[in-house]
Structure formats: structure tokens, C-alpha cells
């Protein structure tokens, strides 16, 4: 059993700093799920200083604090012809960001595993894992499918020369980590890798049956638990990139199907928006909001919605 704090896409936000005040005895691991750059609110150089602070925090205890890479980070490292232009929104700072990432590649992983749960930026599909295994078979001596696991994948990632596009292994690996879609502009294809894949495709083709991911902003006020067949995925990212409660690897969570989630999401969002639309008619806004939320939701849920949606 492990208690894990999963920190969703950062995008320059300082919200992660709340974990610095949590006693180490209260958790087993802290996992950063990537996307440290490309903020639409926080400008440069604060984004760079924020990333340095995150790296320093992780280096204080690399055994229990894990730093994973996201698509917005990898776009600055890619050696392929088009990879660097896919999600890099700060071309005027690309050299500085690339240097910061390279200086800390020794602590940046692709994924983390704990008690059968796989933590990554976006998730692993069967289709993508087959692609990467094919590369390993063709370019690594004596590789067997049985060798493939998260530790092995991270080891190969750390062996890459992230500056040499003439290195065939590095180029092939990077190409698979780049945007790898053909039909969808959002990344909703099973061919997409662990930095890009979206919920529908991940749930239908998950390589690991238990995964925790960021990347897609599904959450309103709490983590989202979705399942399809035997696949169970916990989604942790929201539009405001809030940090939610611990993930307990021994706990049984209530998972929804995508249709169930869509219905719940629309209904919940309508209630929240209706309450916000009525605020101009009430002098005591706080009391009105709390009473309205308590009318529609349990006390626990109402408190969470108030905290993340109205404060």
C-alpha cells in the first residue's frame, strides 16, 4: 500500500508548492506528471525559475519524489524534423527551456510504477507499446518482450543522446514520443504515445490496466475515475491544474464509464454555471453559493466544489 500525491500539468503554476508543507511521513511518493512550461498566465522568466525550484525539491529526495516528462517539455528536446514545433508555445525561449531540461534529464523519467499502478503524463496504449518494442527488437541486442517494463523503458530513455539526430536509436525513440497521430487533431488515437494519447483511445487500448495520468483537463473538483472493460484510469488534471487528494494504491475507487462521466459532467457543470449566473442577485454571495451547492450535492462534494470553483 502506498499514498501518492500526483501533481498534474504545472504549466508555470506555483500550486505545486503546497506539497512542500506536507510532512514526509504523510505520503510515500510525490509524482510530477510533466508539462512544466508553456503557461498562458505566468510569463518568463518565472516559468524557468519555477521549474528550477521543482527540480531542487525533487533532488532533495529522488527516492520518493518523481519527475516525469510531458509533451510540452519534450517538444523542446525532440531531435526530429517536426517534433519541436508541435507543442512548443515559447519559441523565443526555446533555447533556455531546452537547456534547463537537459540540465535535469538525470531526474526526468517517462513513467513511474507503484503497486501495479503506472504513472505517466498521458498513458500507455497497447499499440504504442508494440511500436516501441519493435524499435527495441531492431536496435537492441537480444531484447525480448519479457524485458519490457517501466524500469527498462526509463533506462533506455536515459541512455538517449537528446542532441544527436544522427543517432538512429535516439531519432526513432523521439519520433515515437512525438505527435504520432493520423486522424485526430487532439491526440485521440491509439497510435499516440505516453505524452499525447487522450482518454477515449487510452481506455479502449490500455497496455497497463491501472494507470494515473494528466494531460487532459477532465477534472472539475476531484480526480476522475474511468473504466472500460478491465482498464481503470485515474485522471488528475483540471483547467486550473489543482492538486487533489492522495491516491491510495490499496483503495477501491468507484469508476465510471465514459458515457456515465459525460452525463455527470454536463449535469454538474450546468448546476455550477447556474449558481454563478445568479450571484449578481445576492448580496451574501458566499452563503447563497454554499446553500445552493448543499441543495444539489453531499456536504463533502459541496465543499470541494466551493473550494475549487468559487474561491
Label the predicted regions.
Residues 6-8, 69, 119-120, 213, ...:
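Short hydrophobic beta-strand that contains or immediately precedes a catalytic carboxylate
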Residues 37-41, 67, 193, 197-210, ...:
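Catalytic phosphate/metal-binding cores of nucleic-acid and nucleotide-processing enzymes, i.e., regions
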Amino acid at each position: 500500500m502506498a499514498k501518492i500525491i500526483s501533481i498534474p500539468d504545472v504549466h508555470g503554476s506555483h500550486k505545486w508548492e503546497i506539497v512542500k508543507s506536507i510532512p514526509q511521513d504523510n505520503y510515500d511518493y510525490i509524482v510530477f506528471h510533466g508539462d512544466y512550461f508553456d503557461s498562458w498566465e505566468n510569463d518568463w522568466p518565472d516559468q524557468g525559475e519555477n521549474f528550477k525550484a521543482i527540480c531542487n525539491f525533487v533532488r532533495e529526495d529522488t527516492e520518493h519524489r518523481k519527475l516525469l516528462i510531458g509533451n510540452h517539455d519534450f517538444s523542446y528536446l525532440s531531435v526530429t524534423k517536426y517534433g519541436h514545433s508541435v507543442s512548443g508555445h515559447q519559441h523565443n525561449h526555446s533555447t533556455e527551456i531546452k537547456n534547463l531540461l537537459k540540465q535535469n534529464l538525470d531526474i526526468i523519467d517517462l513513467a513511474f510504477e507503484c503497486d501495479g499502478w503506472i504513472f505517466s503524463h498521458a498513458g500507455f496504449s497497447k499499440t504504442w507499446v508494440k511500436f516501441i518494442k519493435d524499435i527495441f527488437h531492431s536496435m537492441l541486442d537480444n531484447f525480448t518482450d519479457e524485458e519490457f517494463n517501466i524500469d527498462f523503458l526509463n533506462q533506455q530513455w536515459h541512455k538517449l543522446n537528446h542532441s544527436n539526430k544522427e543517432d538512429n536509436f535516439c531519432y526513432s525513440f523521439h519520433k515515437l514520443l512525438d505527435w504520432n497521430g493520423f486522424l485526430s487533431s487532439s491526440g485521440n488515437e491509439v497510435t499516440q504515445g505516453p505524452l499525447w494519447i487522450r482518454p477515449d483511445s487510452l481506455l479502449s487500448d490500455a497496455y497497463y490496466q491501472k494507470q494515473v495520468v494528466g494531460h487532459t483537463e477532465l477534472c472539475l473538483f476531484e480526480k476522475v475515475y474511468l473504466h472500460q472493460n478491465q482498464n481503470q484510469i485515474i485522471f488528475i488534471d483540471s483547467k486550473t491544474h489543482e492538486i487533489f487528494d492522495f491516491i491510495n494504491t490499496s483503495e477501491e475507487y468507484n469508476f465510471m464509464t465514459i458515457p456515465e462521466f459525460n452525463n455527470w459532467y454536463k449535469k454538474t457543470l450546468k448546476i455550477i454555471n447556474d449558481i454563478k449566473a445568479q450571484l449578481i442577485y445576492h448580496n451574501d454571495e458566499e452563503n447563497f453559493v454554499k446553500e445552493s451547492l448543499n441543495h444539489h450535492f453531499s456536504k463533502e462534494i459541496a465543499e470541494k466544489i466551493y473550494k475549487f470553483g468559487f474561491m
